[in-house]
Amino acid sequence: MLIFDSGVGGLSILKNIKKILPNIHYIYMLDNESFPYGNKTEFFIIQRSIKIIHTIKKIYPINVVVIACNTISTVALSILRKKFDIPIFGIFPHIKAAEKITKNKIIGLIATKATINSSYTQKIIYEYSCSNTIKIIGTNKLAVIAEKKIRGVAVSQKKLKNIFRPWINLPTCPDTIILGCTHFSLLEKEIKNILYKTRSVYFIDSIKKVIFQIESYLKTSNVNQKIKKNIFLYSKNNNNLKKLLSFLKQYKFTVIKHINLN
């Protein structure tokens, strides 16, 4: 199984997969050379995704791909499924779930600008805004803050307030917030403290949905695992990567190595 993202947000998906399928072997591709995907063009996102799958598929016998990134999923998943003959799973902003939960009919959606601007997201926003007010924050800064938090950098309250200022000033805030990026679940506590010190809020990420899809597929398809190691690949060697190595120990990767995607 190949799981890939431009950062470590996708490790939250891997963590959940390990809980339900502890014997699965996996490759995690950290495309940190392209971090964050959210500020890239659709053309770049599509071509980069094709390059990642094609390159790794030539080296390792992968039989399932998990795109652990809302941006790539909303922009490129349909193209990737046509391009490759293996099952590819993606993760999407789960507005349908938010509609079932919201009580004040005000739903918040936080995602990267590329995710917000994708035709997929625009379509579902239009579909569900008929019966709900959907407040949107498109930002590429939040994923960067989450990555820094994992490396031990304190989260800046000032930066968070600047990002969420459009909601802070609302007379009524969303009571349900969709986390449209796998990084954002790392900042739930900080976001709640900024917006809802005395009120409750329900956060929705789409991890549970994609995990259910992956679990259902793997349990019914008898996938033959030819990879017998857990491998961590990265596209750029830098100081940020070195700071992540201690964090990665919990995932028990047996191989950590660079891969050239250029």
Curated annotation (Swiss-Prot):
Active site as annotated: C69, C181
Pathway connected to this protein: Cell wall biogenesis; peptidoglycan biosynthesis
GO biological process: cell wall organization; peptidoglycan biosynthetic process; regulation of cell shape
GO MF annotation list: glutamate racemase activity
Protein name as catalogued: Glutamate racemase
Catalysed transformations (reactions): L-glutamate = D-glutamate
Signal peptide residue numbers: none
SUPFAM superfamilies: Aspartate/glutamate racemase
PANTHER family: GLUTAMATE RACEMASE
NCBIfam families recorded: glut_race (TIGR00067)
